[in-house]
Amino acid sequence: MKALNIEDPVVLCRATDHIAEQIAFIADLERKGFTYATGDGIYFDTSRQPDYGFLARLDKAGLQAGSRVDIGDKRQATDFALWKFSAPGEKRQMEWESPWGKGFPGWHIECSAMAEKYLGDWFDIHCGGEDHIPVHHTNEIAQTEARSGTHLANFWMHGYFLIANDAKMAKSSGDFLRVATLVDRGYDPLAFRYLCLTGHYRTQLNFTFEALDAAQTGLDRMRQGFHALSATPKASPDAALIERFTDQVNDDLNLPRALAVAWETLRGTLPAPTKRATLLRFDEVLGLGLADWRPQAVEAPGEVRALAEARAAARKARDFAEADRLRGALAELGWEMEDGAQGYTLKQR
């Protein structure tokens, strides 16, 4: 996470450390009349929730909600397990005592119990993957709202899958992207972050190394452009650009358009210190580490150094035609020469 410039979470909680909270949650649902028992567990009665399934926009009759038992043991196909009984005579690796007998929690109750403990009955934003919409989050909403009588979250934000070469990534197939793999191939991990910024979170992002190459190039150019900007202590961000950037972020987290505003700023005509201050403010959201980046020193080949010396001599002799020719020769080799009061500097393009 550090390599991708992702902040650490404030709380990392384990479901197995919160069994008591899950049992208390189920017991409260039972007291409110939202549960019933079958031969293999305690189930949530979705018929008690008239708007069950609204998040997924699905008909209750067509929604198969993570059932662990045959429909014959449940009142509705959408009903789901809150607590499962351990099989008689069998010892499970993970099982706990409860008011209903020895067993273990269902698939969804842990999230409601831990969210309630650390965030309260009602919070602003709930995130998850697109695959959580039809079952897991639908059931989480049902059980939490049944207990609390309030909405679980004001906003639901579901990230769509990262796919590779037009196929879903899967550990089982070995086609699973790791940061270490990118580093081993010579990529900056923040190039992957840049790539993610180019796609909206509610669209699937197709990962290819060609796309990562383009992202690395874009990141390098933004870093180099930022690094070339002069700074003054009193420079302030441009208020109009900050407003435009913020509007894009507030528009369903439209980071591709926010990134476009950053590029427009870098290429625009504002004074360099204002550009720099504005981009620094943007990077508090984009997280590309612009202020921390430093260009790596690259030793120019002998041929390049010789051309640079020849151009410096031609410029000193005021042979500008020859100086321009030599500058072009340097460019063909992928180098550029910047003149200054103390001489020249060479930069690889």
Residues of each region from the PLM?
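Alpha-helical recognition segments enriched in aromatics with Gly/Pro capping
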Residues: D8, I19-S230
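Divalent metal-dependent hydrolysis catalytic cores, especially in the metallo-beta-lactamase
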Residues: K2-A15
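Short, hydrophobic secondary-structure boundary micro-motifs
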Residues: P9-V10, T38, D324, D339
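Aromatic- and histidine-enriched alpha-helix N-cap/loop-to-helix transition segments
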Residues: D17, G106-E110, L253, R257-A260
